[in-house]
Swiss-Prot record:
Residues 325-446 are annotated as: Domain IV, binds dsDNA. The gene is dnaA. One of its GO terms (molecular function) is ATP hydrolysis activity. This is Chromosomal replication initiator protein DnaA. InterPro entries: AAA+_ATPase, Chromosome_initiator_DnaA, Chromosome_initiator_DnaA-like, Chromosome_initiator_DnaA_CS, DnaA_C, DnaA_dom, DnaA_N_dom, DnaA_N_sf. PANTHER family: CHROMOSOMAL REPLICATION INITIATOR PROTEIN DNAA (PTHR30050:SF2). It comes from Clostridium acetobutylicum (strain ATCC 824 / DSM 792 / JCM 1419 / IAM 19013 / LMG 5710 / NBRC 13948 / NRRL B-527 / VKM B-1787 / 2291 / W). It is found in: Cytoplasm. Residues 1-73 are annotated as: Domain I, interacts with DnaA modulators. The keyword Transferase does not apply.
Length: 446
């Protein structure tokens, strides 16, 4: 089926190429990767939201009609952002709740996420070396391997690169890549449909298990229980486990201690935001892959303005190329400034509000904003709520009554108590200092 889809797509883009300018073709069509085909629809992977919107609004009909020339059939086309592919696959697999999917092939892996397409810099060199070592010698180098870092820094790329490398060198290897959300959903379905044995066979009879965003199993007792036994079964059988998270194990709240200690058994590698030189290298790599002619001063401008993560960096580049294509203007620093003005100004003008603080703190502790406003006083909610109140008092000009009101109508004395408690604890608690520092970083313009 994959070979049939690739052949169809190659014929399709050959037709499309004759309908577009070279710049438009290279900018929009060349970035598409076919994912799957069924009776009536075809799903295509695209790199970002901006590209998805342009394709849907300007090129979707061209793609559909070009395919119809080849197949005489009008397929429905769905564009998926690369990061959505796993979620979409999860949903497909869950539609048949009477069957636990046992696919352990490379179909779960994005073909773009390989070691040779990963840009190495000071911010990720250690993590890259660790991943390559694991790929070359599964279960012999570091087990488990735990990778952590912020959104869009390349964790998923490195994890899937491990899977590709192992399968390229041993096609018979059983490799499973899964998000923690999918793991949880499959567990729920297996319990509901009395398919526990099939579920356990899928995840405990593999050579390599890659779990992305493992922090989301925190607070889910049944999922943690199941994953604990899965981890033990694989580790005891000398099978490789790779985990990713947005923070180190010690900073994942409501994670069971027995899992936390196991996550720390092997090697922990972090990925930081790319430095200036790495950002330039990433932009050059993207331009080369997409056959884009981008002046050096424009790349310097992008790298100077966009510092947070790789997705935003590549998205800015595509936005500039699109702006150039749609306005028929040559790519220059002035054009780049105009194309990115909304993005840059929104970052520069980002004000810290109570709503923002609640959003960031709840996300950090894997809670809902509603939890902060509820009457619940369990430790896993009360402590993050106090941190959010402390930051609201420290970082905004809102009055104590206004802060209390934002946290479910609490009295101003409750806010004072929270502020004083956190302030006092910060004098001696290094872990709390680290937590506050990590949360505060998320407020800063990037």
């Amino acid at each position: 089926m994959a070979a049939q889809l690739n052949e169809l797509w190659q014929k399709t883009i050959n037709i499309i190429k004759g309908e577009l300018t070279e710049v438009s073709f290279n900018t929009w069509i060349k970035s598409i990767t076919p994912i799957s085909i069924d009776k009536d629809s075809i799903r295509l992977s695209v790199p970002n939201q901006f590209t998805k919107e342009i394709l849907e609004n300007r090129y979707k009909d061209l793609i559909i009609n070009s395919m119809k020339i080849i197949t005489t059939k009008k397929y429905d086309i769905a564009f998926l952002i690369s990061s959505e592919e796993a979620l979409e696959t999860d949903e497909d697999q869950e539609t048949d709740t009477n069957n636990v999917n046992t696919d352990t092939s490379s179909s779960m892996l994005n073909p773009k996420y390989k070691f040779d397409s990963f840009v190495i810099g000071n911010s990720n060199r250690f993590a890259h070396a660790a991943c390559l070592a694991v790929a070359e010698a599964p279960a012999k180098a570091y087990n488990p391997l735990f990778i952590y870092g912020g959104v869009g820094l390349g964790k998923t790329h490195l994890m899937q690169a491990i899977g590709h490398y192992i399968l390229d060198n041993n096609p018979k290897a059983k490799v499973v890549y899964v998000s923690s959300e999918k793991f949880t959903n499959e567990l729920i379905n297996s319990i509901k449909d009395d398919k526990n044995v099939e579920f356990r066979n899928k995840y405990r009879n593999v050579d390599v298990l890659l779990i992305d965003d493992v922090q989301f199993i925190a607070g889910k007792e049944r999922t943690q229980e199941e994953f604990f036994h899965t981890f033990n079964a694989l580790h005891e059988n000398n099978k490789q486990i790779i985990l990713s998270s947005d923070r180190p194990p010690k900073e994942i709240p409501t994670l069971e201690d027995r899992l936390r200690s196991r996550f720390e058994w092997g090697l922990i590698a972090d990925i930081q935001a790319p430095d200036f030189e790495t950002r330039i290298a990433i932009l050059k790599k993207k331009a080369d892959v997409e056959h884009l002619n981008i002046p050096n001063d424009v790349m310097v401008y992008i790298a100077t303005q966009i510092k947070s993560n790789i997705r935003e960096l590549e998205g800015a580049l595509i936005r500039i190329v699109a702006f150039s294509s749609l306005t028929n203007k040559e790519i220059s620093v002035d054009l780049a400034s105009e194309a990115l003005k909304d993005i840059i100004s929104s970052k520069q003008n980002k004000q810290i509000t109570i709503d923002l603080i609640q959003d960031v703190v709840s996300s950090y502790f894997n809670l809902r904003i509603e939890d902060f406003k509820s009457a619940r006083r369990t430790k896993n909610i009360a402590f993050p709520r106090q941190i959010a109140m402390y930051l609201s008092r420290k970082l905004t000009d809102m009055s104590l009554p206004k802060i209390g009101e934002a946290f479910g109508g609490r009295d101003h004395t409750t806010v004072i108590h929270a502020y004083e408690k956190i302030s006092s604890a910060l004098k001696e608690d290094d872990d709390l200092k680290y937590t506050i520092n990590e949360i505060t970083k998320r407020f800063s313009p990037k």
